Structures are given as structure tokens and as C-alpha cells.
């Protein structure tokens, strides 16, 4: 119980009651990998971000003329011009057309979209709808143009939160403006040119898909981070009421952006950002496990448990998370994907080994070891475990399913020729002798589709061959059957003719005998008649 209580304390930050016995499960090859907090999200609102791509330069005493800014302005104009033209083509109806397609009362230039999916048309509708907020966008534009503040908020009657970001201005404020009077114009111009050149390279790289069609290509995570610059955490905190870090929200792809306007005169880009609503279920943990083979009842086996489970209080479910977004510490889902576990699986997760089910392993390509917090958990009965420092072979007893190798046992470990450095101590305080009955091992090998298809194809080819041979045999049998039928018919007719002949002979013999008998009686009667006549005459 001591080891189990230690495991519970390890998860106390997430939940007050943890039933999964991590230590016992690790001894049978079921190793915990990651614990994540479960959160649900939905796209519910949007905000507009105004990005000023050309910074304000504080006037200097020596009136420096920064040629780098002029060149940067020219290059950036060439970069943004295709985006602005593309947006205008999509947001404006096609010229010369009397009838325009309308979505929610807004005219869209369908010809500018080309072949587009439903999602892309929806994105175009979103772009055009953003044009209706021209007053709010203009207010943000005019506000940001004359200020050196990197972030501020503007609220309209719709209570939509708009955040204006100057990605370059933050750097100008903290570095450049403090040194303007202490450096020559040439040095300042060179330093500014270097910074602007790097930023321009970054913009060109991350916005390359936007040059094709900004309405149909959402802004990538890299583009959002590039736009926001060092202001990313502040923007996320201002738009989302959550304690989750900005890095995790962006890496999960929960914030999606779309360029809706480009103002070439002011060198500003207006981006619509879809802001998700995030709700965290405080007592719900999603635990990832990694299964390796174990030595059970003198054979290599693997435990039959799901790779990911959801634990809420004292209950566990299988949790595939097929449609979720995973980060290091959180898992974001639009709905709950939990699936029920059998009672035996729950008992097994709780550390009741007698309720666990194992499947025998067939084949040599199997997961036989895993790195865990600087230690190695391996099935040393199915692979060669050799400690190189100090040098000795590692033996796994029959009553141990796997072997945990930490710094006290080995410093440099070789597993079938692969070398690992052990840097940590194992947190397992005890290891018990495992007793697993033969009835707990069942055959649940997954089907190798390619192999089975090859077998089926071979069987079909053999079947076709046998069918051809069978048809040939049937043809020969049918011919022989005709000849046999003729012979049998002849024999039957011959027998019938013999029988008829015998019957005819018998009938002829009987008829002849009967005729003779009748003739004899007739002669006898005639003799008697003659005698009677003679007697009468006498």
C-alpha cells in the first residue's frame, strides 16, 4: 500500500483520489507516459487584430534619414499588394454582372473564389462580413497610427474586443529609441535595416500561402506568432479568460486567424482571429500509457488495456481522443469521447493482477522496452540486456514480467546493441512476485491485412485452377457417361429380348401341349361316339 499511496500523492495536484495503481501496472509492462488535463472548447467569438508593420521612429537631434525604412516600406508594399488585391476581388462583386450571389445579405465576388469548398466559401463570407466593421477598424487604425504603445484595447457598441499590436514597435521602444541620440545615423540605419530585414524574411516565409488566396488560406500558427511578436501572451490573456498558457493554446491550433484587410498607406494588416471558449473539467484526467511485452507463464505476452484512459474521481473510461487536440499538459476536445471499460479492466487498472488479460506475442518486431524518467523498463527475457558500466549481463527471473533498470543497477545500458545512459533512480519502492494463471492469456492477435489478402488471393488462384480441372473432369465424365449409357441400354435390351424369347418359348411349349391334350380328348370322344353308334345299330 505504500507504493500506491506514493502514486496517489504524485497526482494530488490534479485530483484527490486516484485509483490507477501506476506501480503495479508498470511491473506488468503497462507504463504511464503522460497525464493531461481535459478541457472542452468551441469557437464562439472573434476579435480583430491590427498589426502595424512599419514602426514609428522617434525624431532625433541630428535628423537622421533612415533609408532602410524607405526600402523596407517599398518591399513590404510589393509583398502586401497581391493580398490587398485578392481581398478586394473577393469582397467586391464581379464587374459587369447584374446578378450577384449573396450570403447573409452580403455580395461576394464568386469569380474570385474559383473552385472552393464549403469551408472556403464560409471563410470568404467571414472576410466580407469583416468589411462591414469598417468604422471600428478605422477607429483602431487612426488610434494606433500616432502612438508608440504596443497594445491597447478599443471597444465598440457590439462589445467586441479589438487588440492593436505593433510587433516591431515593441523592439523600437525598448532598444532603438533609447540609443538614437548616442549613435551615428549610419550605425542606427544599419541596425534598423538588419532588424527590418529579418522581420521581412520572417513575414515572407510565414505568409507565403496568403499570397495565393488569403480568403481560402487560414493564417498558420507561425504567422500569428510572427504578427503578435512578443505581445502574444498579453493578447491571449486579454482575449481569453483562462489560466492555460498562450503557448499551449497556439500550439493546439485553437486560435485561427484570417487576413481581412490590408491598408497599404498606413502599412497595417487587419486580422480576424477566432477566439475559442475553453472550459476545463477540473477533476478529469486523461492518462496515456505505453505497453511493452512482458514475460508471462514462460512466454512473451502483452497486456490488453487501452493506450489512453479518462479518469474522473474513482471511475475510468477508455478515451481514444481521435478528434482532440493534444499539447504537453492539456487535451482539448469538442465533446466527450469516453468509452466504457469492463469491470475486469477497471480491477486490473486498480492493481488486481488476477483480473488482467494478456495476449501472447507472435513475431520478433515488438515493443520490448521504454524510457521512463531517466530509467529503462525492459523485457530482458525477450531481448539482450547488458550493462556496460559496470559490465555484467542483466538477468530477469521467471517471476518478473519486466525489469526496471535505474542508476543503482547500471550507468550505461545496452539493449540489443542500442546504448542508453541511465541518469535517474526508480521511484518504485517494492516489486512483488507475480502469479498469473494460464486462463488470463488469450489469443487476440491483430490481423495482418496484407498477409491475409495474399492468402486469399492465393486461395482464389488455386480455386480457379481447381475449377478448371474440375470442368475438364466433368467433360470427360459426361462423355464416358454417354458411352456407358449406350452399353447399359444394349445390355438391358438384350436381357429383355432373351427374357421375351424364353417367355415365348414357354408359351409355345404350353400351347402345343394344350393343343395335344385337346386333340387327344377329341379323338377319345370320337372313339366313344363310334362305339355308341355301333352298339345302337347292333
Swiss-Prot record:
Gene behind the chain: F
GO cellular component labels: host cell plasma membrane; membrane; viral envelope; virion membrane
Compartment annotation: Virion membrane; Host cell membrane
Entry superkingdom: Viruses
Family membership: Belongs to the paramyxoviruses fusion glycoprotein family.
Protein's recorded name: Fusion glycoprotein F0
Role noted for this protein: Class I viral fusion protein. Under the current model, the protein has at least 3 conformational states: pre-fusion native state, pre-hairpin intermediate state, and post-fusion hairpin state. During viral and plasma cell membrane fusion, the heptad repeat (HR) regions assume a trimer-of-hairpins structure, positioning the fusion peptide in close proximity to the C-terminal region of the ectodomain. The formation of this structure appears to drive apposition and subsequent fusion of viral and plasma cell membranes.
Keyword flag Hydrolase: no
Organism: Mumps virus genotype N (strain L-Zagreb vaccine)
Alphabetical keyword list: Cleavage on pair of basic residues, Coiled coil, Disulfide bond, Fusion of virus membrane with host cell membrane, Fusion of virus membrane with host membrane, Glycoprotein, Host cell membrane, Host membrane, Membrane, Signal, Transmembrane, Transmembrane helix, Viral envelope protein, Viral penetration into host cytoplasm, Virion, Virus entry into host cell
Amino acid at each position: 500500500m505504500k507504493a500506491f499511496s506514493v502514486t496517489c500523492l504524485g497526482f494530488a495536484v490534479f485530483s484527490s483520489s486516484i485509483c490507477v495503481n501506476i506501480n503495479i501496472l508498470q511491473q506488468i509492462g503497462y507504463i504511464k507516459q503522460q497525464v493531461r488535463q481535459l478541457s472542452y472548447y468551441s469557437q464562439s467569438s472573434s476579435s480583430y487584430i491590427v498589426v502595424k508593420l512599419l514602426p514609428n521612429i522617434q525624431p532625433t537631434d541630428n535628423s537622421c534619414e533612415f533609408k532602410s525604412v524607405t526600402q523596407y516600406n517599398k518591399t513590404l508594399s510589393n509583398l502586401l499588394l497581391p493580398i490587398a488585391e485578392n481581398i478586394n476581388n473577393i469582397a467586391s462583386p464581379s464587374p459587369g454582372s447584374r446578378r450577384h450571389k449573396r450570403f447573409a445579405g452580403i455580395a461576394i465576388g464568386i469569380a474570385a473564389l474559383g473552385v472552393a469548398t464549403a469551408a472556403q466559401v464560409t471563410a470568404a463570407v467571414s472576410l466580407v462580413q469583416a468589411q462591414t466593421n469598417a468604422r471600428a477598424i478605422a477607429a483602431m487604425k487612426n488610434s494606433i497610427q500616432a502612438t508608440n504603445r504596443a497594445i491597447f484595447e478599443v471597444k465598440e457598441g457590439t462589445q467586441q474586443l479589438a487588440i492593436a499590436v505593433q510587433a516591431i514597435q515593441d523592439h523600437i521602444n525598448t532598444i532603438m529609441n533609447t540609443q538614437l541620440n548616442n549613435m551615428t545615423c549610419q550605425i542606427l540605419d544599419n541596425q534598423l535595416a538588419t532588424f527590418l530585414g529579418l522581420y521581412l524574411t520572417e513575414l515572407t516565409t510565414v505568409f507565403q500561402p496568403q499570397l495565393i488566396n488569403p480568403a481560402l488560406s487560414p493564417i498558420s500558427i507561425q504567422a500569428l506568432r510572427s504578427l503578435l511578436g512578443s505581445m502574444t501572451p498579453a493578447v491571449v490573456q486579454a482575449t481569453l479568460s483562462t489560466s492555460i498558457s498562450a503557448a499551449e493554446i497556439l500550439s493546439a491550433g485553437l486560435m485561427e486567424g484570417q487576413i481581412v484587410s490590408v491598408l497599404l498607406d498606413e502599412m497595417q494588416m487587419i486580422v480576424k482571429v477566432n477566439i475559442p471558449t475553453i472550459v476545463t473539467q477540473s477533476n478529469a484526467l486523461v492518462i496515456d500509457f505505453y505497453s511493452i511485452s512482458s514475460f508471462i507463464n514462460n512466454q512473451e505476452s502483452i497486456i490488453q488495456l487501452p493506450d489512453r484512459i479518462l479518469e474522473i474521481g474513482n471511475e475510468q473510461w477508455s478515451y481514444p481522443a481521435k478528434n482532440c487536440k493534444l499539447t504537453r499538459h492539456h487535451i482539448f476536445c469538442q465533446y466527450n469521447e469516453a468509452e466504457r471499460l469492463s469491470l475486469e479492466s477497471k480491477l486490473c487498472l486498480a492493481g488486481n493482477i488476477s483480473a488482467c488479460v494478456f495476449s501472447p506475442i507472435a513475431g520478433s518486431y515488438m515493443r520490448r522496452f521504454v524510457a521512463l524518467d531517466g530509467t529503462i523498463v525492459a523485457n530482458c527475457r525477450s531481448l539482450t540486456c547488458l550493462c556496460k558500466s559496470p559490465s555484467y549481463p542483466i538477468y530477469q527471473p521467471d517471476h518478473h514480467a519486466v525489469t526496471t533498470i535505474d542508476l543503482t543497477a547500471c550507468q550505461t545500458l545496452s539493449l540489443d546493441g542500442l546504448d542508453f545512459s541511465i541518469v535517474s533512480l526508480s521511484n518504485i519502492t517494492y516489486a512483488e512476485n507475480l502469479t498469473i494463471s494460464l486462463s488470463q492469456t488469450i489469443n487476440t492477435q491483430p490481423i495482418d491485412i496484407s498477409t491475409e489478402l495474399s492468402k486469399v488471393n492465393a486461395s482464389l488462384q488455386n480455386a480457379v485452377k481447381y475449377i478448371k480441372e474440375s470442368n475438364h473432369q466433368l467433360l470427360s465424365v459426361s462423355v464416358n457417361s454417354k458411352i456407358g449409357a449406350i452399353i447399359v441400354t444394349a445390355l438391358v435390351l438384350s436381357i429383355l429380348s432373351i427374357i421375351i424369347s424364353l417367355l415365348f418359348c414357354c408359351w409355345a411349349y404350353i400351347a402345343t401341349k394344350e393343343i395335344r391334350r385337346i386333340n387327344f380328348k377329341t379323338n377319345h370322344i370320337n372313339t366313344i361316339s363310334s362305339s355308341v353308334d355301333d352298339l345302337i345299330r347292333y
